């Protein structure tokens, strides 16, 4: 077996049972990975320097194909209502078949960290059969110093072989696509999908499993902090496509990270060393920081259509998918934190993409309301972020990230509420979805409105304004905010048909109440009392 690059020879691929490989390319950096990806025909070069790859039929995650080994160690630890399972014997067969499939292949390996806090990070080694996948995960996770590689010993191992086709009968999975996790052996197997996001979310799922036991709250959120001496940090919870990346990229604040973080007794820390931003309809004017990364060498663009002659990207072209993405190192953002860490947050923002158009653009939540809405996780799945999803769909994704939460939501909810109370955190619910009507009749909330409201929330001025009680949801909504049309703050005023608004709001309230029944036995009375009411209450 030929080896290229630096690694700890005492902990090579044989340790995980990968033998008879043609070659392993270890810890290659962007220039070499560009060469390999282009030589193999895996990707194209865009004008500006980004590497552009397509993922075939899988243009989003495949959550229904994700399974966890179910055994004595996980039986009472995993939320099985939300996680698929396979037996230990089925996983053993799958692993052996992965090893057999890899024989004779050239693989790429990256030794990386998940977690900017050394006390709570995981050493993740990722084997891929595609060179561009190796660059993707190198961009997304935290890269060790070169001098650390010779002594690097992996804790978590991910093997990503898109050309592997699972056998549902033999392997106990749902289809030819499989994402299988064995928490005991600390192995993740990804087969049948070239969608690169599966790798980063596998690391996230692993951290979501192990960190609560150490008293650390893992979160599907972005984070930023003030540039001044206060360094006040803020968290932005939200499902993919609701605005976490866009809204945390604010030139007036320091970016901590765009997607995955932990909250420990020492403050918050990024799980990653890069960003994975949606690029569909990306605008140089609206999102200049993200746009600039698409014109840099080292960025990976996924399923972005480029002109065959000029190689200029067309960010408005959704021919391949709505879920077009770019992956780049965090230091491509000028105001990004060099450490990936910050103090305890002063504000938490829960982003919801309201597909019905009846929720206000911003509301202030009490501690009980915050836990209610965190466990509810109301939003819309945005087209393209999951395979087969072509239009926004109202959904409840608990913890604003149900596909990545292996434990019961109450584990994360109780951690969050305790940390919020301990550190006196203000919580805001922000609707980045529709206003003036639902999908098809209304319009998306203007990003300038959202940014203005967030600015007021984060600088403390919004908390000092006058609030009214929302007649359906009960939370506090500002009456007036400088720079924002008063009508927008009251959703009913943006609808032409007031009766249709009342009917739609009541329908959504009913959905909230039905969804929360599964959590009622896991929360206190004040959280149960925070749920919306079926009939409007006095404002």
Curated annotation (Swiss-Prot):
Q: What are the required cofactors?
A: Mn(2+)
Family, according to the entry, reads as follows:
Belongs to the phosphoenolpyruvate carboxykinase (ATP) family.
An example of a GO molecular function for this protein is: phosphoenolpyruvate carboxykinase (ATP) activity
Gene of this entry: pckA
What this protein is called in its record is Phosphoenolpyruvate carboxykinase (ATP)
The yes or no answer to whether the keyword Lyase is present is: yes
Q: Which residues bind substrate?
A: 61, 195, 201, 325
The cross-references to HAMAP family, in alphabetical order and at most eight, read:
PEPCK_ATP (MF_00453)
Got any disulfides in this one, which pairs? none
